[in-house]
UniProtKB/Swiss-Prot annotation:
Identification of the protein by name: N-acetylgalactosamine-6-sulfatase
Record keywords, A-Z: Calcium, Disulfide bond, Glycoprotein, Hydrolase, Lysosome, Metal-binding, Signal
Glycosylated residue positions: N205, N425
Record organism: Rattus norvegicus (Rat)
GO cellular component terms attached to this protein's record: lysosome
Gene that specifies this protein: Galns
Residues the record marks as active site: C80 (nucleophile), H143
Residue positions binding Ca(2+): D40, D41, C80, D290, N291
Classification lineage: Eukaryota, Metazoa, Chordata, Craniata, Vertebrata
Length: 524
């Protein structure tokens, strides 16, 4: 099925869905609220509903029991920033510019010194939702650029409590400043200063602060009778892993498990508030993660990717297959499991559909509208593309995944103890040199072999059939692809968070060094 026919088919499926919701009729009711819960480095196997044996996620498991579980839901990239850019634009990072051309097949993101960020030419989800009267808030990690022009309130959000990057540090504020925490336009402190994180004990109150921001926003918008979009993008399971005092030491899985338990408790409180306010039937909630669990973290500080190979930074299943739950009481029937191949980019198009809006017609949108899947059980045929930088590494079509390139990380890093596939290395598959397979891709049947350990024999009829179908999809994709201007090539220490807006009031302004733009170095 071509991309064009897939889009037409999706629209045909969507029309009766929108009619049923009353969104196409004159005088349609207020569109539903939208809550996207995006975790940071949480793995597919971290939830009880996906088989995690300690069963420490009762609220998320209940959310799945009351909604729809997606076992085959994917990130658009195995790293934070490109994945988030894809969610908010509905477009692959190769299209929206969140990639690097500094080296072949390199993952890149937005550290403090990055010059680039989300381009003004991209239409972000909150910008479009404003057209339908939504009030939009981001809580947590932005990660789409540090410079003033990339501020989330310049890209459709009305409120922000969080940071432009993760809680890395502590830094010395001389060579590198601590990351600021913002309330709307101005910083209100920095990580490890006004917002402490105890690296020895793992204690930090950040998740509780993020939770309270979400609850207060929901209550306020409910009182205003205004449709709202809440993008709750907390960073609790990203290393260094932290949890609040009341959750530390409560999990069988160590500090990482403590963080997961606190997240689960927070999600439960958000869902309970929606129910107690009587707005759960008019609020669509989706839970997922930005990429797979980071398996290189310290002992008991990394998550689980279940049966899948490797983790964050790789384009094996463990790096890009995510936990995903849709919840919308009264609309999504309880207890469903969908085998639709889903993507984080689908949240863009689905959210627009919920608001009664169409995606921009002047560009390619990679995200599909999943309402026909969630409300009527339809399965839409589509490929999943796995990129690393500007390199197409693999594609999944149906149950078959074809690897065009394989690489985990360099031998140099591996010998230093950096292993993205600890205890899982597969000969000829998890390679420490970049191996090209474009002529004869490694093809796996993910239904029989989710761990990507046994590639199909090149001479088998099954391989030849899968090769023919995936080759057609790859050629069509590459022929029509117009890459965006790469945003992650140039770094400059002078653009770090030395003197963010609001630093004067706090006495937190630091002196930036001389401006020296240079090529960013991306190791893997």
């Amino acid at each position: 099925m071509t991309a064009c026919s897939t889009a037409i088919r999706a629209q045909q499926l969507l029309l009766p869905v929108l009619s049923a919701l009353g969104l196409l009729a004159a005088g349609a009711p207020q569109p539903p609220n939208i809550v996207l819960l995006l975790m940071d480095d949480m793995g597919w196997g971290d939830l009880g509903v996906y088989g995690e044996p300690s069963r420490e996620t009762p609220n998320l498991d209940r959310m799945a029991a009351e909604g729809m579980l997606f076992p085959s839901f994917y990130s658009a990239n195995p790293l934070c920033s490109p994945s988030r850019a894809a969610l908010l634009t509905g477009r692959l990072p190769i299209r929206n510019g969140f990639y690097t051309t500094n080296a072949h097949a390199r993952n890149a993101y937005t550290p403090q010194e990055i010059m680039g960020g989300i381009p003004n030419s991209e239409h972000l989800l909150p910008e479009l939702l404003k057209k339908a009267g939504y009030t939009n808030k981001i809580v947590g990690k932005w990660h789409l650029g540090h410079r003033p022009q990339f501020h989330p309130l310049k890209h459709g959000f009305d409120e922000w409590f969080g940071s432009p990057n993760c809680h890395f540090g502590p830094y010395d504020n001389k060579v590198k400043p601590n990351i600021p925490v913002y309330r709307d336009w101005e910083m209100v402190g920095r990580f490890y200063e006004e917002f402490p994180i105890n690296l020895k004990t793992g204690e930090a109150n950040l998740t509780q602060l993020y939770l309270q921001e979400a609850l207060d926003f929901i209550r306020t918008q409910h009182a205003r009778q205004s449709p709202f979009f809440l993008y709750w993008a907390i960073d609790a399971t990203h290393a260094p892993v932290y949890a609040s005092k009341q959750f530390l030491g409560t999990s069988l899985r160590g500090r990482y498990g403590d963080a997961v338990r606190e997240i689960d408790d927070s999600v439960g409180k958000i869902l309970s508030l929606l129910q107690n306010l009587g707005i759960s039937k008019n609020t669509f909630v989706f839970f997922t993660s930005d990429n797979g669990a980071a398996l290189i973290s310290a002992p008991k500080e990394g998550g689980s990717n279940g049966p899948f190979l490797c983790g964050k930074q790789t384009t094996f299943e463990g790096g890009m297959r995510e936990p995903a739950i849709a919840w919308w009481p009264g609309h999504i029937a309880a207890g469903q499991v969908s085998h639709q191949l889903g993507s984080i980019m689908d949240l863009f198009t689905t959210s627009l559909s919920l608001a009664g809006l169409k995606p921009p017609s002047d560009r390619v949108i990679d995200g599909l509208d999943l309402l026909p899947t969630m409300l009527q059980g339809h399965i839409i045929d589509r490929p999943i593309f796995y990129y690393r930088g500007n390199t197409l590494m693999a594609v999944t079509l149906g149950q078959y995944k074809a690897h065009l390139w394989t690489w985990t990380n360099s031998w140099e890093e591996f010998r230093q103890g950096i292993d993205f596939c600890p205890g899982q290395n597969v000969s000829g598959v998890t390679t420490h040199t970049q191996e090209e397979h474009t002529e004869l891709p490694l093809i796996f049947h993910l239904g029989r072999d989710p761990g990507e350990r046994f590639p199909l024999r090149f001479t088998s009829n099954e391989y030849q059939d899968a090769l023919s179908r995936t080759t057609q999809v790859i050629q069509q994709h590459q022929k029509s692809l117009v890459p965006g201007q790469p945003q992650l090539n140039v770094c400059n220490q002078a653009v770090m968070n030395w003197a963010p807006p609001g630093c004067e009031k706090l006495g937190k302004c630091l002196t930036p060094p001389e401006s020296v733009p240079e090529k960013c170095f991306w190791a893997h």
